Every structure is written in structure tokens, then in C-alpha cells.
Amino acid sequence: MKEQKWIHEGLITESLPNGMFRVRLDNEDLILGYVSGKIRRSFIRILPGDKVKIEVSRYDSTRGRIIYRLRNKDSKD
């Protein structure tokens, strides 16, 4: 049976070494996020201030996997 995961949206507040980030979720929780393999392979750059979708396990709600970087409304890309 596959493990159930919660998907949240959050804001990157701090960049840490080795593809890790401090993420503030929309419900004001601070968690540690790491970059998923697809984002790492696609060379998608994640910077502080970016909005992301993060997948959090039910068993460890202090860590999550960043699965998508949302587009900023003011950027041209």
C-alpha cells in the first residue's frame, strides 16, 4: 500500500546546502524541504521568495519534498 502524502503550498524563506530549503507553509508552519529528482534533473532554479508545492509525509511533518515551483505573477519567464 502506498503511503499517503499531503500537498501544501509554501514560500521559500532560506536556502540551505545540498538542495535543502526552509519553507513557510500557508498555515504558518516552518518545515525543511528538499528538491525532488525531476526538479534537480530539469535544472529548475529555486530561490528564496519563490512559491512552491511541497509534499509532506503523514509520519514526519517536519520534512517535505518540493515537487513544483509556482510561477511568480511579476516575472517575465
From Swiss-Prot:
Residues 1-71 form the S1-like domain. GO terms for molecular function: ribosome binding; rRNA binding; translation initiation factor activity. One of its GO terms (cellular component) is chloroplast. PROSITE patterns: S1_IF1_TYPE. Component of the 30S ribosomal translation pre-initiation complex which assembles on the 30S ribosome in the order IF-2 and IF-3, IF-1 and N-formylmethionyl-tRNA(fMet); mRNA recruitment can occur at any time during PIC assembly. NCBIfam families: infA. One of the essential components for the initiation of protein synthesis. Stabilizes the binding of IF-2 and IF-3 on the 30S subunit to which N-formylmethionyl-tRNA(fMet) subsequently binds. Helps modulate mRNA selection, yielding the 30S pre-initiation complex (PIC). Upon addition of the 50S ribosomal subunit IF-1, IF-2 and IF-3 are released leaving the mature 70S translation initiation complex. This is Translation initiation factor IF-1, chloroplastic. It comes from Antirrhinum majus (Garden snapdragon).
